[in-house]
Regions:
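Cytosolic juxtamembrane helix and N-cap/initiation of the first transmembrane helix
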Residues: 1-14, 133
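Transmembrane alpha-helix entry/boundary detector in multi-pass membrane proteins
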Residues: 2-7, 24-45
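Interfacial segments of alpha-helical transmembrane regions
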Residues: 6-11, 58-73
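Core segments of alpha-helical transmembrane spans in multipass integral membrane proteins
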Residues: 14-16, 36-50, 69, 73-76
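Membrane-helix interface and helix-disruption motif detector
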Residues: 27-36, 86, 108-116
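Canonical alpha-helical transmembrane segments
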Residues: 43-64
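C-terminal TM-helix exit segments that contain a strictly Trp-centered aromatic cap at the helix terminus
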Residues: 70-92
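Alpha-helical membrane-associated segments of multi-pass integral membrane proteins
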Residues: 94-137
Length: 143
């Protein structure tokens, strides 16, 4: 991968993470411990990204990859949690709902948006793409 492509991926990652931080803080996504997890991970991503850009060594790249995996996992867990809350709310509103009707109402609910945490997963994947065949991870050829 070219250095330019790697820089573009990092820029996309940082813009996306900055957007997520702003959105979560503006929406008040800070009511309990679990709601702080994506905010903390987003800030960790910013910090580790700065380290990787300034000191691209194997150790910093591996740390960056670990944070990106946590971003991916947090997105999947967030989708589950948002969906779960939406299902509970829909059942409170209409206990007769079940099957596809319940699923449809829960997945399309506006608050919390069930698929919004998927942005964390997408950004984690972009971060992992940044590390693909990173020069700091390639074996050194003696010669």
């Amino acid at each position: 991968m070219s250095d330019d492509a790697r820089r573009i991926l990092m820029a996309i990652l940082l813009l996306g993470v900055a957007g997520i931080i702003a959105e979560l803080l503006l929406l008040g996504h800070d009511e309990d411990f679990y709601q702080w997890i994506p905010i903390a991970l987003a800030f960790a991503t910013m910090l580790v990204s700065a380290i990787v850009v300034m000191r691209p060594a194997a150790g910093s790249i591996r740390l960056f990859q670990a944070v990106m995996i946590l971003m991916i996992v947090s997105g999947a867990v967030g989708i589950y949690l948002h969906f779960e809350v939406n299902m509970e709310f829909q059942l409170e509103m209409d206990p007769a709902l079940s099957g596809m009707n319940l699923y449809r109402k829960a997945i399309l609910a506006k608050t919390p948006p069930a698929l919004a945490p998927g942005a964390m997963t997408q950004l984690g994947l972009i971060g992992l793409a940044y590390t693909f065949r990173h020069p700091a991870l390639l074996p050194r050829v003696a010669g």
